[in-house]
Amino acid sequence: MNISKTKQDLWEYLSEVRRPLALYGTGDGADKIISILENHGLKDLIAAVFASDGFVRERTFHGFKVMSYGDCCKALAPKDFIVLVCFGSSRPEVLSQVEKIASEHELYVPDVPVYGSILFDRGFFEENIPDIEEVFSHLSDDISRNCYVNYINYKLTGNITYLSDCESGPDDEFGLLDGISEGCFVDLGAYYGDTLIRYLKKYPCLKRAVAVEPESHSFKRLEKCAEELESEGFGITCINALVGSSTGTEQVSTARGRGTRALPNSNVELKNTRSIDVVTVDSLDIGKAGFIKFDVEGSELAAIDGAKDTILRDRPVMKIACYHRSEDVFALVKKVLEIRPDYKVYMRHTRCIPGWDTDFYFI
C-alpha cells in the first residue's frame, strides 16, 4: 500500500525553490515555524510578516514589522513569494481569508506538532511506514481510508487541498456513535462543557458524566455548565485534574489557555506553574463506561494506558484526538488494539487549519 507518493516534504520543497516567505500570523505557531526554518537553513528566506487586519497594530515580530496582507503584497512586489500560515482556526471567515490568499499566492499551512518535538517530515514518515500502513489496514470504511491518506499527505506537504479533500461535517460522527450503550460519559478534556452538552443531549442513554478539565478558568465555566445539566436530570461530576497513565501530581503553567499540560518532554515552556492532580480513567468512580472522549493535549497515549482496565471491562465507544503529536496518527490505534483488538476503527476530520479537529473512533 502506497500511502503517499510525495517525493518531498514541505521543508525540502522550500529548500529547493528558495523563494521569499511571508509568514501569516505572530503567535506560538509562528515561533515554532521560524525555529524549524532556522533548523533547515531557511530562516534567511523570511521576507515579511503579516496579520489579519484587526491584529496588525504598531508592532514587530522577530524583527519584522507586522503588516497587513495588502501592505505585504505591496512591499514584496513584484517578488513571487510563498505564504506560510502560522496559526490555527476553524472560523469560517478566517478560512475564507486563507482561501482568498491561496488563490493569489502559493500558500501552505505547515504541520508542526502541538506537543512534542518530532516533526512529521519525510524522514519520519519513511521510518514509520510499516506502522502507518498497519493502521490503514485496520480502518473500517472508505471515508476513513480517504481521510487517512489525505491527512498523511497534508502533514508532509502543508497543502490544504488535502485537508479539504477529507473533510466531514461536524455531525457526521453521529452515524458512528449510534452504537453508544447505556453507561457513563467520560469527558477527558471537557473544556467549558460544550461536549458534555453535545453528547448527553444526543444520547439519552448516557445518564451520567465525569468531566475532567485541568485549565482553571475553563473549569469554572465547566462547573456552571454542569449545574445547568444537573437541573435537567443529568448526574455530572467535574474534576479539575490532568489525565495520565498513573495518579499523582504534576506542574502546569498558570497562563490562561486551553492547552494546559506542560510536560518535561513537550515543547511547552514552563514559566509560572502550579501543582495539579493527575488522575487515570481507571481511578475514577464511573461504574460502567459507555463513551469516553479523549482530548488531553498530547497525553492521549498515557491516558489510554490509564484506562486499560476500563477498556477491557466495558469496551466503551471511544473518540480520541489524533493531532497533538506527530506519532498519534499510528501510535494511538496500535495502543488501543493492543488492549482490545475487537474494535472497529474510523477516522474523521472536520474543517480546520492546520489538521486539528481530527479524531479516531473506536466502535
Q: Model regions: which residues?
A:
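Phosphate/nucleotide-binding beta-alpha loop and adjacent structural elements of enzyme active sites
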Residues: 1-43, 52-363
